[in-house]
Structure formats: C-alpha cells, structure tokens
C-alpha cells in the first residue's frame, strides 16, 4: 500500500495535489492526485489501528464532521485550505488515527465522534450551516479515549428548523452562529454582529427552556478553545459564522480568589 508520509507536498490552495512517495512525479491529472491523497488518508487511519463497527455497536456521541473536498476540507462547515500549516497537522492526526489537538478537551469527557466524508470529486462552493447526520461505515481508532473516523456515503440533511428567538435588525450585517450544546445537540441561529455574547447565552437559555442546564460559559471550538467575554459584541469577539460551545461550570459557585 502506498503511503503519504506528510502533507507538505500540497502546493496550491485551490487544487488538491499530493504526490506518491519516493519522489515520484505527480500524476498529470490533478483529480487523480486528489483521489490518491484522500484514499491514502483513509487507508492510513485504518492502518493506525481502526476496527470496523457494525451499526448496532455505535453509540450516540458528540459529532465533529470533516469533509474532504477537491479544493480543501471543512470541519463542521468551517472551510480550510489543504496548504495551510495548521490544516496539515490536523489531517496528519486524522491519518494516524488520533484526535487533532485542537479538538481535545473541547467536549469535556464526552466521546467525540469524528466523521470524515470523502468528497474528493466535488468542489466546496460555500459552507452551509446545516446538520448532516451520519450514515455509513464507522471505524473506531485505537486510543485510550475512543475516537471515530468514518467514510460516509450519500446522506440526507436534517431540516430541523432553528428557534427564531432573536430580534434582528435587517439594516445591519447578520451572521450565523453554530451552537454545540452540552448535551451534544447542535443548533444554528442568526444574530446581528452588534449583538453581544450575552445575547447568545440568553438564546441558549430560552432554547433549552424547562430543561435548562446548570450554570455555563461559552467558548469557541476552532481553531482553539477560548472562553468568551460576554460583554463583547460578535464583531469585537470575531465571531462571524463561528462555532460556539456550551461549557457547563463544574460548580454553581462563582470563581473567587483563594
């Protein structure tokens, strides 16, 4: 089986080109090079210790959706270039059957279900903030905390409507915020960029209603974990089209100096 030792051979941002090992020349067909790269990633993930799971063995977990396109890849609809250094480290971890470091600790003791879709024959035109449930074959990667990498087939989009609980000003810029709740549920809501982080927190409390969770804080998920100042606007906090995580506080008692 041919191996891809690293992702440094990806030269261009908008074309997936990863050549064969041993300094062999690139295929004249960029599409074939892209297919080779994506297929190798799945092969290396399985080689790292994956085992096949039947549908009855798979448990419901927190989902992280990764799609490998011809011109880049998306992580929960966040588009990334193959040529970016951080992207190469991210994909190298996936190839080794490991959870990328930027996702570690984000979901706090939850088992993360990383789903990888092969879309190497398609170009990602834009990100769509909709949840896409998984259907296909799963592979559990060997590690202390179970991880999932799965090659999905064609899937149906979950058309669950979001709660319209936020008053919008159509004369101001509007952005979509993806919100991962502590129970693993995901929702998408529109906000003006002049809204504050506290408005997102208010929306979550209304969304959860009678099933309101214990005290929580909000944090970003990508590219790294960062707790958010609730007094900042979405524009000031650079949260346009961002992914937000609900983090439960371990105690209802406020932080205090010892």
UniProtKB/Swiss-Prot annotation:
Superkingdom: Eukaryota
Protein name as it appears in the record: UBX domain-containing protein 2A
GO biological processes: autophagosome assembly; cellular response to leukemia inhibitory factor; Golgi organization; membrane fusion; negative regulation of ERAD pathway; negative regulation of proteolysis; nuclear membrane reassembly; positive regulation of protein catabolic process
Region described as Required for interaction with CHRNA3: spans on this chain: 1-152
Start and end residues of each UBX domain: 170-247
Region (Required for interaction with VCP): 168-258
InterPro entries: NSFL1C_SEP_dom_sf, SEP_domain, Ubiquitin-like_domsf, UBX_dom
Cell compartment(s), UniProt: Golgi apparatus; Endoplasmic reticulum; Perikaryon; Cell projection, Dendrite
Subunit structure: Part of a complex composed of STUB1/CHIP, VCP/p97, CHRNA3, and UBXN2A that modulates the ubiquitination and endoplasmic reticulum-associated degradation (ERAD) of CHRNA3. Within the complex UBXN2A acts as a scaffold protein required for the interaction of CHRNA3 with VCP/p97, this interaction also inhibits CHRNA3 ubiquitination by STUB1/CHIP and subsequently ERAD. Interacts (via SEP domain) with CHRNA3 and interacts (via UBX domain) with VCP/P97; these interactions are required for the interaction of CHRNA3 with the STUB1-VCP-UBXN2A complex.
An annotated GO cellular component: cytoplasm
Role this protein plays: Acts to repress the ubiquitination and subsequent endoplasmic reticulum-associated degradation of CHRNA3 by the STUB1-VCP-UBXN2A complex in cortical neurons. Also acts to promote the translocation of CHRNA3 to the plasma membrane and subsequently increases plasma membrane acetylcholine-gated ion-channel activation. Plays a role in the inhibition of STUB1-mediated TP53 degradation, via its interaction with HSPA9 which acts to inhibit TP53 binding to HSPA9. Positively mediates the ubiquitination and proteosomal degradation of RICTOR, may thereby act as a negative regulator of the mTORC2 pathway.
Keywords: Cell projection, Cytoplasm, Endoplasmic reticulum, Golgi apparatus, Nucleus, Ubl conjugation
């Amino acid at each position: 089986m041919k191996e891809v030792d690293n992702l440094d051979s990806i030269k261009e941002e908008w074309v997936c080109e990863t050549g064969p090992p041993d300094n062999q020349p690139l295929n004249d067909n960029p599409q074939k090079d892209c297919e080779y790269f994506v297929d190798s990633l799945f092969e290396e993930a399985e080689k790292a210790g994956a085992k096949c799971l039947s549908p009855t063995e798979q448990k419901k977990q927190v989902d992280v959706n990764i799609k490998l396109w011809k011109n880049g890849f998306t992580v929960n609809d966040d588009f990334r270039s193959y040529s970016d250094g951080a992207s190469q480290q991210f994909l190298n971890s996936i190839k080794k059957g490991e959870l990328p470091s930027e996702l570690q600790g984000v979901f706090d003791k939850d088992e993360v279900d990383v789903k990888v879709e092969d879309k190497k024959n398609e170009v990602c035109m834009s990100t769509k903030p909709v949840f896409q449930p998984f259907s296909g074959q799963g592979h559990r990667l060997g590690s202390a905390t179970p991880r999932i990498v799965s090659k999905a087939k064609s899937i149906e989009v979950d058309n669950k409507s979001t709660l319209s609980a936020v008053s919008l000003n159509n004369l101001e810029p509007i952005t979509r915020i993806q919100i991962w709740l502590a129970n693993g549920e995901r929702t998408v809501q529109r906000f003006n960029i002049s809204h504050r982080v506290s408005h997102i927190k208010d929306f979550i409390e209304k969304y959860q209603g009678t099933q309101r969770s214990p005290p929580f804080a909000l944090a970003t998920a990508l590219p790294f974990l960062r707790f958010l100042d609730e007094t900042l606007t979405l524009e000031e906090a650079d949260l346009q089209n961002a992914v937000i995580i609900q983090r439960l506080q371990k105690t209802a008692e406020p932080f205090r100096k010892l």
